Amino acid sequence: MVSFKSLLVAVSALTGALARPFDFLDERDDGNATSVLEARQVTGNSEGYHNGYFYSWWSDGGGYAQYRMGEGSHYQVDWRNTGNFVGGKGWNPGTGRTINYGGSFNPQGNGYLCVYGWTRGPLVEYYVIESYGSYNPGSQAQHRGTVYTDGDTYDLYMSTRYQQPSIDGVQTFNQYWSIRRNKRTSGSVNMQNHFNAWRSAGMNLGNHYYQILATEGYQSSGSSSIYVQTS
């Protein structure tokens, strides 16, 4: 469920140099919305750095989705009757780091709270799903085993996307999944343990691009408010 989209975002007009608890994602690649924003209807997809963290935001433009970046690693997403979006904060490149995170995640319908990243050579989109809404993405993927880590069992899956949007345009690529059996919205994720488990299951990664603690939604509504750190 990935789509990088032109996001439909409603932003209230702001005047003056007011300090804001959140920065709205604007159209500049650096993502630092420190200047006054004017009212706008459409914000383009973007990635860059904000308060020392890498961020990525993509939407297919359907429905309403609003992404706001707070202090440090904090971000917030609100969405209603959306198409497909995925966004969050983390690092570039991805590594086997241990990721600490917490916050709230309240999907009404289909949505994921996950560690999300990409590699090249091979081109792979990967997910470590910590919580999800009404749809378990493993239900239509190939089960490749399990791994016990960070206090629970994760089921491993692989699926293939044919001629779909990716970090390198429209491509065919594999998706790797680790799906936690008991959902949670805070904790630690040892990514090296997942990478090792995938490799043992024949699911090989390439050279890492970004790695974020992401919120993703598809044809749903909801909200999330998340912070992320590394140990």
UniProtKB/Swiss-Prot annotation:
Optimum pH is 8.0. It comes from the Eukaryota. Its EC number is 3.2.1.8. InterPro entries: ConA-like_dom_sf (IPR013320), GH11/12 (IPR013319), GH11_AS_1 (IPR018208), GH11_AS_2 (IPR033119), GH11_dom (IPR033123), Glyco_hydro_11 (IPR001137). One of its GO terms (biological process) is xylan catabolic process. GO terms for cellular component: extracellular region. Optimum temperature is 40 degrees Celsius. It holds the Pfam family Glyco_hydro_11. Induction: Expression is highly induced by xylan. Pathway: Glycan degradation; xylan degradation. The keyword DNA-binding does not apply. It is found in: Secreted. Residues 41-229 form the GH11 domain. One of its GO terms (molecular function) is endo-1,4-beta-xylanase activity. It catalyses: Endohydrolysis of (1->4)-beta-D-xylosidic linkages in xylans. Its main location: secreted. Inhibited by the proteinaceous endoxylanase inhibitor I from T.aestivum (TAXI-I). Residues 1-19 form the signal peptide. The active site is at residues 125, 216. Glycans are attached at residue 32. Keywords: Carbohydrate metabolism, Glycoprotein, Glycosidase, Hydrolase, Polysaccharide degradation, Secreted, Signal, Virulence, Xylan degradation. Endo-1,4-beta-xylanase involved in the hydrolysis of xylan, a major structural heterogeneous polysaccharide found in plant biomass representing the second most abundant polysaccharide in the biosphere, after cellulose. Plays an important role in causing fusarium head blight (FHB) on cereal crops. Belongs to the glycosyl hydrolase 11 (cellulase G) family. This is Endo-1,4-beta-xylanase A. It comes from Gibberella zeae (strain ATCC MYA-4620 / CBS 123657 / FGSC 9075 / NRRL 31084 / PH-1) (Wheat head blight fungus). The gene is XYLA.
